[in-house]
Regions:
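Amphipathic alpha-helical substructures
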Residues: 154, 161, 184-284
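Structural motif
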Residues: 326-335
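Juxtacatalytic substrate-recognition/specificity segment
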Residues: 24-162, 209-212, 253, 257
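Catalytic Zn2+-binding segment of zinc metalloproteases
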Residues: 129-145, 169-187
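Short loop/turn segments immediately following the C-termini of beta-strands
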Residues: 323
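Bacterial N-terminal signal peptides
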Residues: 9-23
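Multi-bladed beta-propeller domains
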Residues: 283-305, 334-391
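Blade-terminus and WD-like Trp-Asp/Gly-His loop motifs, strongest in beta-propeller folds
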Residues: 309-317, 389-398
């Protein structure tokens, strides 16, 4: 089990790094370096100013992160600054012998989960540094023979912790130390509330999933909220106790260490968390209804993420970018009003329904609300994401 879990985590780390490896400047390129007491920041000449700003604040961020996590790495960390895909991202490689961070300079769009921030370099450094400081804590006992033979020296927390905890904790740190990011934006509470209202908060077994739209956001958004809930329930400093227990002589596996600190298995406490989040969402919905809040009419229920909605200048069409599944972005355009084809299809459905209901043993079939509507046009993305900031041209016939 340990070997399979470790292989998965190593594979996942390398998979995340693949775009950077393929698209970024190679080792033979022109590299420049800023050095600080704990970091080496490597960059191509075109990123010199961005790297200089990062170097100016990296030691103060280091001091805050190490104090918050409760551990300070002994090795200097290499930081690589690049922008291979013109999108917001970062990577952390928590190897015990040579930890490294990769920072992509393009900032996120405002409507994304991490779109609420004050300084992109600060929040990106805080999140990725949290990974390093959190995960390079070594064992406080000698390594086993098999662990000494491992080609990738990883600490006990990296080997034992599930993905939701790894990403959730870095997300928690990014918010706690910057006052921005996912914990302070509107996207995270919106997702938690919507999932709660629909009874779709992921089960514990799916919390670390990498498949589906929820798999892309759940470890960050739901995982960080669960960790905040755990520490509020158990008391300040309880998460630091968990990290120490995982690296201790009697640490055991993750479930055993978690139970030693919080008193119950993670699955049981997560079920309690889900119940509370659902109850809070329903109570808030009822409160807003009593206050007379009108949310508007639901037009479509779509799988995955939908962003950048924009009505055409003539008011006849709706443009939006869609990410129905991770790395499956597209642009979609709908007719706002019901089309003649849709009207005929609805008439045929009603005629079939009326004919069936002539049989007294049949019961009427309630149609889906809102009725699903297919886009008039779609344009798949040619890369791993969706086009950024699509908008109508003035003629209302073309999209930029």
């Amino acid at each position: 089990m340990l070997r399979r879990r470790l292989a998965f985590r190593i594979g996942w780390t390398l998979l995340l790094a693949l775009p950077a490896v393929l698209d970024a400047q190679g080792p033979s390129g022109v590299w420049q370096t800023f050095e600080t007491p704990h970091y080496r920041i490597h960059h191509a000449p075109e990123f010199a100013e961005w790297a200089r700003r990062a170097a100016a604040q990296i030691e103060s961020i280091h001091e805050r992160v190490t104090s918050f996590v409760g551990y300070a790495p002994g090795r200097r960390v290499d930081v690589i600054v690049q922008d291979p895909a013109a999108t917001a991202n970062g990577l952390a490689f928590p190897f015990l012998d040579r930890p490294a961070i990769v920072l992509w300079t393009s900032p996120p769009e405002a409507e994304t989960a991490i779109g609420y921030y004050h300084d992109w370099a600060e929040i990106l450094l805080t999140h990725e540094m949290a990974h390093i400081v959190h995960l390079v804590r070594p064992r406080n006992r000698p390594a086993t023979f098999l662990q000494r033979l491992s080609p990738l020296p990883l600490g006990p927390i990296m080997r034992k912790a599930p993905r939701w905890l790894i990403e959730g904790y870095a997300t928690l740190v990014e918010g706690a130390l910057t006052g921005s990011g996912r914990p302070y934006g509107t996207f995270r509470p919106m997702v938690i509330r919507r999932f709660g209202l629909e009874g779709k908060l992921p089960g514990y077994g799916a919390l670390s999933s990498v498949s589906g739209w929820a798999g892309g956001v759940a470890p960050y958004l739901v995982g960080s909220t669960f960790l905040e809930w755990l520490e509020a329930r158990e008391g300040k400093g309880s998460l630091q106790k968990l990290w120490k227990r995982l690296a201790s002589r009697r640490g055991g596996d993750f479930t055993r260490a978690f139970r030693a600190v919080f008193g119950d298995p993670p699955e049981d406490l997560y079920d309690r968390f889900r119940a509370e989040m659902t109850a809070h969402a329903l109570a808030e919905e009822q409160r807003l209804e009593k206050a007379g809040l009108v949310e508007g009419e639901l037009w479509q229920k779509l799988e995955g993420a939908t962003a950048s909605p924009q009505v055409s200048p003539d008011g006849r069409r709706l443009l939006a970018r869609r990410v129905p599944r991770p790395e499956r972005g597209l642009l979609a355009v709908w007719d706002i009003e019901e089309t003649e084809e849709e009207r005929r299809a609805e008439e045929r459905r009603r005629e079939r329904e009326e004919k069936l209901l002539e049989d007294p043993e049949e019961v009427p079939e309630k149609p889906a609300q809102p009725r699903p509507r297919r886009p008039k046009w779609t344009l798949p993305a040619i890369d791993r994401g969706a086009p950024r900031e699509p908008r109508w041209m003035p003629d209302g016939e073309r999209v930029l």
